[in-house]
Amino acid sequence: MAPSRKFFVGGNWKMNGRKKCLGELICTLNAAKLPADTEVVCAPPTAYIDFARQKLDPKIAVAAQNCYKVTNGAFTGEISPGMIKDLGATWVVLGHSERRHIFGESDELIGQKVNHALSEGLGVIACIGEKLDEREAGITEKVVFEQTKAIADNVKDWCKVVLAYEPVWAIGTGKTATPQQAQEVHEKLRGWLKCNVSEGVAQCTRIIYGGSVTGATCKELASQPDVDGFLVGGASLKPEFVDIINAKQ
């Protein structure tokens, strides 16, 4: 990892938890020794964004797990970037594979969401990744490059974008891409940014890995030169999340 890219660890709590158990998790995080050279962001369920922001140590940022592509309107069940900011969150996760595959979000819609979230001042954790059949068909690059292009076409300033590579076959399955597999895709993604955006953006943009990251797998993954952090699912709800945050130490 280049010295200019601060290590980044995001915890995606998904649709999990109630105030009691999330409060206990927050107490664990607040009491832990977290490295100053690692940026930490937690993404609670929408209903608990305000609760998390009030309880978490200020050095831990809060993200929403989704937002819509416009400011206001008749969009039942949606949340806008302005509302997210109003609750004290500063980041949003967009393009997660569960949004793509369960809720049918297209590359085009995700790009529009990224554009609007950035224009409203939120940082964006933009997710990309291939399914198992796509990896086995040898089209991983094609898939992730197309997904990245849909995002890149909507980004003017990359300073507030973190790209999260999450191989769908490794999410919640217990399977993890090997450090070498993760590094290979991250390196190719950085190469795509260099060729299609700019060398400066390629060097400065953090590309993080998501896909069954655990306390046991994080250190070797973190040692790869193009792995700039993690987007953690299930393990972010457990005390081992602290070990993952400390993976570079």
UniProtKB/Swiss-Prot annotation:
Sequence positions bearing Phosphothreonine: T173, T214
Pfam family membership, one: TIM
Database matches in Gene3D superfamilies: Aldolase class I
Crosslink (Glycyl lysine isopeptide (Lys-Gly) (interchain with G-Cter in SUMO1)) position: K142
Residues bearing the modification N6-acetyllysine: K14, K156, K194, K238
Any one Gene Ontology BP term: glycolytic process
PTM-bearing positions, type Phosphoserine: S80, S106, S198, S212, S223
Catalytic activity: dihydroxyacetone phosphate = methylglyoxal + phosphate; D-glyceraldehyde 3-phosphate = dihydroxyacetone phosphate
Residues annotated with N6-methyllysine modification: K194
Pathway: Carbohydrate degradation; glycolysis; D-glyceraldehyde 3-phosphate from glycerone phosphate: step 1/1; Carbohydrate biosynthesis; gluconeogenesis
Family listed: Belongs to the triosephosphate isomerase family.
Name of this protein: Triosephosphate isomerase
Organism expressing this protein natively: Rattus norvegicus (Rat)
Lineage of the organism: Eukaryota, Metazoa, Chordata, Craniata, Vertebrata
Gene (name only): Tpi1
